[in-house]
Amino acid sequence: MAAWGRRRLGPGSGGGGARERVSLSATDCYIVHEIYNGENAQDQFEYELEQALEAQYKYIVIEPTRIGDETARWITVGNCLHKTTVLAGTACLFTPLALPLDYSHYISLPAGVLSLACCTLYGISWQFDPCCKYQVEYDAYRLSRLPLHTLTSSTPVVLVRKDDLHRKRLHNTIALAALVYCVKKIYELCAV
């Protein structure tokens, strides 16, 4: 019981409080190095990133600043669309429970349309992009486990592969429920 709350240290750590550096296999981490070889270096970086995404490495470290920033922004926009779909769809579905029925459709219908629009845009632009399986890693402990000491860049972008099956199911289920609600509500408003 006294060991609760303590981190177990690996062999050879001596119990001195230092965390063990976990070695990763070659299939776990890929580094897109910032090495300029001629005029087509940027294209080479993009090609390496595409190959790493398609190979489904657990971690991808992107040294080139421009490509790293573009990739991080692309992932952020996809996350924003996903969250907007879920939150707007939830607002669409729960607004009729919180507001009087005479006024709830003024909020629920626009929220439902927003949810459907974001879901459609996500489905067209992000759903089949291999980049949507990755998230930008910010956790200092997880970053300390990666071989970042070999990099030449001081601000690399680190991507970690995450299973997004449940996230997509939630996303699509809420958007579909919002669609059903909107169609039903529009039918009721037009029939009156």
Curated annotation (Swiss-Prot):
Q: Which GO terms describe its biological process?
A: inner mitochondrial membrane organization; mitochondrion organization
Q: What are the transmembrane regions?
A: 84-100, 107-124
Membrane topology classification:
Multi-pass membrane protein
- Pfam families noted in UniProt: Mito_morph_reg (PF14972)
Q: Where is this region: Disordered?
A: 1-20
Coiled-coil segments on the chain, per record: none
Q: Taking the first listed entry, what is the main subcellular location of this protein, grouped into a coarse class?
A: mitochondrion
Keywords on record: Membrane, Mitochondrion, Mitochondrion inner membrane, Transmembrane, Transmembrane helix
Q: Which GO terms describe its cellular component?
A: mitochondrial inner membrane
Report the domain of life of the source organism: Eukaryota
Write down the InterPro entries for this protein, in alphabetical order.
TMEM11
Cellular location(s): Mitochondrion inner membrane
Task: Summarize subunit and interaction data from the UniProt record for this chain.
Answer: Associates with the mitochondrial contact site and cristae organizing system (MICOS) complex, composed of at least MICOS10/MIC10, CHCHD3/MIC19, CHCHD6/MIC25, APOOL/MIC27, IMMT/MIC60, APOO/MIC23/MIC26 and QIL1/MIC13. This complex was also known under the names MINOS or MitOS complex. The MICOS complex associates with mitochondrial outer membrane proteins SAMM50, MTX1, MTX2 and DNAJC11, mitochondrial inner membrane protein TMEM11 and with HSPA9. Interacts with IMMT/MIC60.
The family note in this entry says:
Belongs to the TMEM11 family.
What does the function comment of this entry state?
Answer: Plays a role in mitochondrial morphogenesis.
What is the protein's given name? Transmembrane protein 11, mitochondrial
Question: From which organism does this entry originate?
Answer: Bos taurus
This protein's encoding gene = TMEM11
